[in-house]
């Protein structure tokens, strides 16, 4: 990247000099053409820490895979015994396996990189007089960048405008406290200014903790301060710290250092410390099987008194190969890559592959309300003004102030709206509003950072937080928009919204030189700062009436804010005016009820969670009544539970109530609350910890800077892609591109589908290995004329079954659609993973009988209908005496192939019969449905069909059959094959029937009642009984 040449360090230069040196314009920014030219000149805004996906590393992992190592040894032994054909076939399969594995894993790595870019930090940049969000990698020197609370600074900036702006620079300086920035600060040219004291700069990767700012980008990529640190770390280039020679016990520490380094890189080369937990488990499995293969080879040699001839070596090769599922890792990589793509299609970006595996095991979802369960497009629905009464807005377009109607009702302070709604009368907002409305409208517009503008085409375009947009649109209805008011009011000072105190305030000066504070925030937090209302002292009864009105509005599902104002004396220095002074002795103006309607799909998604045994908790900063109304509407709280019901006391809590409970008190509850209102960031962390102590597997949503601790604490952290801060996205495991609660449920469903499919193809692959091992181990007993064992299956036959017959159907199983009951079952246990007891039992049962029917096929043909003459040298060559052996081998090969293909269809469902895979009532069953279930997965159907057809060329094509596969053509033996395959099919169906009879439907969740059906308000049930019925039913047995 080209170094940027400027006359002086930018922190010494004033704003105008920086603007001219970088040939930019603060109001307009660079033009798009100039930005493109500078991108070509200076390069992308990236650190050079990661070279991206390394092809040779991916290739090395394929070669050093345990599965591949066994094949390489087998090829070497084959060439060593001068069996060139067999060695050549094994070598070809090695090349094929490495090629397929390399292509799929490389594509998967590239896909992961591209998906990460989708969730990469964005920068808000002014170019050609328009501010847009662009990929931060496209920033160039001279760009004008706009920052707000929660942003990660995308490059090094010379600040040109700051409003209560602070950044966290702990990453650079180690300073734990945020640094207050000042765009207009200047320094003397010869002054030594440390990095942390350059308060007119904002550094790349620092976090905006407060306020907003604008700055000119002066350094990108490796030219930034963080880039300099990265360069220094690269020069050190050490994963482990080598001890210094003058350290005590230097020699012992040096030996430990070498041991750690060697161990790390050996494990890395072998794949034991890379990849996801499942990939690491399967890699460990591969090496275990490799060890078993060596043991089996030793058993073969021991059976021949360690007199190792060529035939003994070939038999050892066969047995070693039979235990290895050569295509397992490749099929897993393909399945994971497909899972990522499917997730992205369902608006979920997977940032960490571990989350892809874990989603299916989620037991609890802790979700925010605004924009996730609800639409995130708010409208001002109700307003209560003590000096007037009520205003009500009805509209179909949240962003258009010219659409909809405004109605009003003059009422006494103690009147309740719901008793007098019929008396409301329409108000024409285009007329000059009443004096009673002016403080309300000014506060809505001026204490506001949003913009509401109409384009030349008549379209209304809004920017900002939904709550502020709703207030701004409301004031705009009365022609009191912020742009209109700024003509007669001058901005002085802002006290930004703080999640701890839950309020915001601004100070403006009008044309008469009068300074006014406008404040908005949570009702309790504004009310505690108010001393008057409507010109009179605010007494305790007045406060109680305001709270009562707030609860009335909140009971309608409205988010209620309070507005306040006061005239303030001119300060000597506005920047040093304490917030407590500005926000004291306020005059209460009004309550504003804002409505954020639930998304249409939220209710169905919550119901689906209940059926899937997933508990949904809503953690929101809203008022308890607002949270309760929305929770009831979407089904988190059953609609028939009234507000007076005693069970509501544990269903809905405030953050302060929950925080007041000790861990012991929380753990003594049989169920955690469904809704936490007024929830602070630390409350979310406490909730997750409480769930973890109950052995729950938690998904947590978040969008703000303060949500990052809870996102990291959760098993699966979910950030919002549209409204989430960069810090939250960085702390998350997955990102929702549409901020929609139903997308979380979609992700869990996809996670369950993928988990089921991995279990399917793992079972399918390992069953054939178990069967082949049993066949070949027992086959050691079949001795020829020179007392050497004759294998019932040749090495090439085994490789064909494992690579061709099994691999492609296994890939098809990885593409299986979700079962109809995938969201009717309890979450799986992530600690156990795919190697559950049921899978191991099925593998042994199916594998054992595959070995039995294969062995019986061999025995029947050789000893039942044949002569039983095993002749000699039949493991290596064909001659007339080996005809029976080669025919029996063909039949065994056909039986193993067709049984493997039957298993590929049978494992589509672990319990249901092949004739009714989806388990529909038999009265609705028909043959068309049966055929549909067989061919609905087209890739699997074609893979099975082609694998079945491939048996015949291998048996009947001359040279290939006898010289390569070590078998020959058969005739009447097909009858034995058919009977053996039928026996295996019936055996599988009988075992499935036994499984169904042993399986408790309640454990499957098939008949589990939903939350709404489970709750009852019978007075006989105590609170704990009700909690128990609600939640403990859905826990694992």
UniProtKB/Swiss-Prot annotation:
It catalyses: Na(+)(in) + ATP + H2O = Na(+)(out) + ADP + phosphate + H(+); K(+)(in) + ATP + H2O = K(+)(out) + ADP + phosphate + H(+). Its cofactor is Mg(2+). Its EC number is 7.2.2.3. GO terms for cellular component: fungal-type vacuole; medial membrane band; plasma membrane; plasma membrane of cell tip. It is a multi-pass membrane protein. The chain crosses the membrane at residues 62-82, 84-104, 282-302, 314-334, 761-781, 788-808, 845-865, 890-910, 940-960, 970-990. CDD domains: P-type_ATPase_Na_ENA. The active site is phosphorylated in presence of sodium or potassium and in conditions of higher pH. Not phosphorylated in presence of calcium ions. GO terms for molecular function: ATP binding; ATP hydrolysis activity; metal ion binding; P-type calcium transporter activity; P-type potassium transmembrane transporter activity; P-type potassium:proton transporter activity; P-type sodium transporter activity. It is an enzyme of class 7 (translocase). Glycans are attached at residue 869. Pfam families: Cation_ATPase, Cation_ATPase_C, Cation_ATPase_N, E1-E2_ATPase, Hydrolase. The modification Phosphoserine is found at residue 1012. Residues 1-61, 105-281, 335-760, 809-844, 911-939, 991-1037 are cytoplasmic. Mg(2+) binds at residues 368, 370, 703. PANTHER family: CALCIUM-TRANSPORTING ATPASE. This is Sodium/potassium exporting P-type ATPase cta3. It comes from Schizosaccharomyces pombe (strain 972 / ATCC 24843) (Fission yeast).
